[in-house]
């Protein structure tokens, strides 16, 4: 269950991601710096954490998506390895072409930091098998550019193929179709704006994020 948490300059949720990974998946999970050109041998899950990589210069995730480690992340995904991108990590995945669409400024142009409710739209992915279809989760968000956009054809394809896995119950940012998280065609790459790593312990107010890691653990064990 080897897990690698990628660190970019400006990442600020990397410690949270590492803690959640060690707590739920891999006690030996570790960091990988963005200048590395290879993942640790045996890596099964790559975790792209939230933050403000490279200070969000140009666009959120734009520079991080072109950092040296991302070639290895792309190759890992192409081999069927699991990739989880949260918040800025989701932005990096879209910029890198691993997921379609883009994340733009929130509808009200304000930074939003609060617990939100999500509905599980697809409980048949490797990331969501621990949930029930339609289950409502409480997971926090913390972003200023979480407004998901894609062209109409892409949105229609995502919906038709069941690749919208999480949807906001009360849309906080203007995302088209209330989209909070999507997977790639193969189903091994998940990008989402809410922070499941901040919802793995009751002490933090919610354990609803644990299902993602439990689902992955089940997939990795198989």
Curated annotation (Swiss-Prot):
Pathway as given in its UniProt record: Purine metabolism; IMP biosynthesis via de novo pathway; 5-amino-1-(5-phospho-D-ribosyl)imidazole from N(2)-formyl-N(1)-(5-phospho-D-ribosyl)glycinamide: step 1/2
Keyword terms of this UniProt record: ATP-binding, Cytoplasm, Glutamine amidotransferase, Hydrolase, Ligase, Nucleotide-binding, Purine biosynthesis
Superkingdom to which the source organism belongs: Bacteria
GO biological processes: 'de novo' IMP biosynthetic process
Keyword Nucleotide-binding assigned: yes
Any one GO MF annotation of this record: glutaminase activity
SMART domains on file: GATase_5
Documented EC number(s): 6.3.5.3, 3.5.1.2
Keyword ATP-binding: yes
InterPro entries: Class_I_gatase-like, PRibForGlyAmidine_synth_PurQ
Subcellular location(s) of the protein: Cytoplasm
Pfam families assigned to the protein according to its UniProt record, in alphabetical order: GATase_5
GO cellular component, one term: cytoplasm
Domain Glutamine amidotransferase type-1: 2-222
Active-site residues from the entry: 87, 195, 197
Catalysis: reaction(s): N(2)-formyl-N(1)-(5-phospho-beta-D-ribosyl)glycinamide + L-glutamine + ATP + H2O = 2-formamido-N(1)-(5-O-phospho-beta-D-ribosyl)acetamidine + L-glutamate + ADP + phosphate + H(+); L-glutamine + H2O = L-glutamate + NH4(+)
Function, in words: Part of the phosphoribosylformylglycinamidine synthase complex involved in the purines biosynthetic pathway. Catalyzes the ATP-dependent conversion of formylglycinamide ribonucleotide (FGAR) and glutamine to yield formylglycinamidine ribonucleotide (FGAM) and glutamate. The FGAM synthase complex is composed of three subunits. PurQ produces an ammonia molecule by converting glutamine to glutamate. PurL transfers the ammonia molecule to FGAR to form FGAM in an ATP-dependent manner.
Subunit note: Part of the FGAM synthase complex composed of 1 PurL, 1 PurQ and 2 PurS subunits.
Protein's recorded name: Phosphoribosylformylglycinamidine synthase subunit PurQ
Organism field: Deinococcus geothermalis (strain DSM 11300 / CIP 105573 / AG-3a)
Organism placement in taxonomy: Bacteria, Thermotogati, Deinococcota, Deinococci, Deinococcales
């Amino acid at each position: 269950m080897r897990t690698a948490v990628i660190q970019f300059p400006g990442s600020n949720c990397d410690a949270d991601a590492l803690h959640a990974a060690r707590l739920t998946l891999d006690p030996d999970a570790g960091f990988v710096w963005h200048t590395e050109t290879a993942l640790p041998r045996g890596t099964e899950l790559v975790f792209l954490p939230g933050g403000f990589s490279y200070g969000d210069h140009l666009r959120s995730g734009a520079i991080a998506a072109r950092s040296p480690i991302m070639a290895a992340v792309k190759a890992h995904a192409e081999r069927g390895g699991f990739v989880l991108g949260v918040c800025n990590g989701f932005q990096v995945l879209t910029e890198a072409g691993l997921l379609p669409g883009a994340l733009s400024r929130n509808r009200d142009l304000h930074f939003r930091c609060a617990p939100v409710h999500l509905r599980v739209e697809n409980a048949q992915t490797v990331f969501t098998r621990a949930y029930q279809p339609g289950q409502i989760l409480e997971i926090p968000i913390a972003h200023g550019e979480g407004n998901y956009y894609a062209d109409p054809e892409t949105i229609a394809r995502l919906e038709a193929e069941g690749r919208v896995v999480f949807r906001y119950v009360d849309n906080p940012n203007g995302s088209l179709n209330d989209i909070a998280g999507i997977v790639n065609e193969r189903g091994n790459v998940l990008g989402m704006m809410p922070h499941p790593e901040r919802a793995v312990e009751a002490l933090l107010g919610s354990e609803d994020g644990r299902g993602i890691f439990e689902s992955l653990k089940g997939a990795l064990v198989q």
